Amino acid sequence: LVQKWVGLSLFGQNLPQRLLILDGKPNTGKSTLVLILQALIGEENVCQLRTECLAERFELNRFRGKTLLIGCDVPGDFLMKRGASVLKSLVGGDPLSVEAKGLNNAFQVKGDFNVVITCNSRLRVRLDGDAGAWKRRLLIVRYDAPPPQKRIQHFDGVLLKEEGSGMLNWALLGFARLKEDLRETGDF
């Protein structure tokens, strides 16, 4: 699942309209995976996701030109925040009106962003009677393995330096596998 999702992120459009949640014990590799993903995609294509700001007037403008939105080490109530329901539109292919400071006219963006969220606890979701839509969009991977005995500083950089081309090939294979899944089942 993670391989396919990383491949999807390289593609840049969220075809299956899903968001990835990596939750579980600290020091188990969740943030390392996200740092590697950012490096593969390019920092210029990534933006921090702030659910508490999603309902604000100019927040969506921050996502213009981005393909990956990340919420790293978020609190357990991250999906309970006032603007969290906008996430469904950000990944669901919906047209979104965006306002930018200093511009008189709003413009449209398509909500096909890839979204990954990491958390050391299980996230709680404000359903607002829309449990089906949330269930359809959430992909959850639990990190329950014990942390390593010895931490390697800047492990993401070490892995990218030593295994970068292999990781890119792994992600591309994941995207090929996802495309096959989408042809066969329409989903992961």
State where each predicted segment sits.
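Feature primarily recognizes SF3-like P-loop helicase cores of small DNA viruses
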Residues: L1-T28, T32-F188
